[in-house]
Amino acid sequence: MATPTENETGLNDALENESFSISIRRDEIIAVDITLSTEVNLSFQYEKLFATLRSLPQNCTTVNLFLASFGGYMQGLVPLFNAFKYCQVPVDVYVTGECYSAGAMLALSGRSLTMMPNTMLMFHNSSGGEFGKGNELYDAVMHGTKHTRGVFKNMVTPFLSNAELEGLMHDKDTYIHWDQPDLQKRIRRHFNPKKEVKK
């Protein structure tokens, strides 16, 4: 892992590990570029990223997230999604490659979404397992299913319709391609719901 150097802003010029990389661009306006091109890992691997997002200087006006992730852990997805969604500086998301599962959900965490040519999002239900005694297993499955539904609803609607959300919960995958006719309508509906005109 590279050792970052400090500068007058208190941010690092470069910061990276196996899960992400950050670069700081200095013009008159500071922009932060973040690249996530691996699976979404467990949240402890993003502690420096979280710290960076919490300590952005006042003259930083944009965070650019470049995303090409093939999925990963929900335990890492939730804090990552929240870090971008509620960042004090607006986050613009650029999908640069295929994004599956947790990667697709992370694409909806910013203030805007741009899908580059030949890219795709694939949404599907979560997978996992439980172990324990009989009633504990039952409770874990019931509460886990309820929690997953709530997380999915909060993250993917209204980009995905309620019918598509129900499909996800019943293991029907949903694919969104960069050139499909309704993509811009989905983006407006999700990121600018007040501006979406109902017909």
Short names for language-model regions:
Residues V63, E130-K199:
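Charged, glycine-interspersed solvent-exposed loop segments at helix/strand-loop junctions
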